[in-house]
UniProtKB/Swiss-Prot annotation:
It is a peripheral membrane protein. NCBIfam families: ATP_synt_epsi (TIGR01216), PRK00571.1-3 (NF001846). GO terms for cellular component: plasma membrane; proton-transporting ATP synthase complex. This is ATP synthase epsilon chain.
Amino acid sequence: MNTLRLNIVTPNGSVYEREDVEMAVLQTTAGEMGIMYGHIPTVAALKTGHVKVNFHNGNEFIAVSDGFIEARQHQLSIIVQTAEPASEIDVERAKLAKSRAESHLEEDDDNTDINRAKRALERANNRLRVAELQ
């Protein structure tokens, strides 16, 4: 069976690479999308969620933030601000981040950046959801 090369890149560089991907399932802004070897060239906007990576002897979940994907016949590139395999998510740290974001949203303070706090809460909740998938 032909397989796909997957590369997930953040501003800090490549954070996940795999050469033997049979299928990657992503949440795009247009809905869920599955990418396999031979997929037509595609560019799509990715929303905060997870990527499910299927390979010969199992699968893995990666928490990702908003970003973009580029699919080619034999390669899938995912460009996001943050990405973290479920196996590496520090659940306690994610719970603290969630609590901090909720506190910022509850503050009645002109200095609170509401949009930033909402994004932080969304990221923390996503990390907690993905950690449970592992």
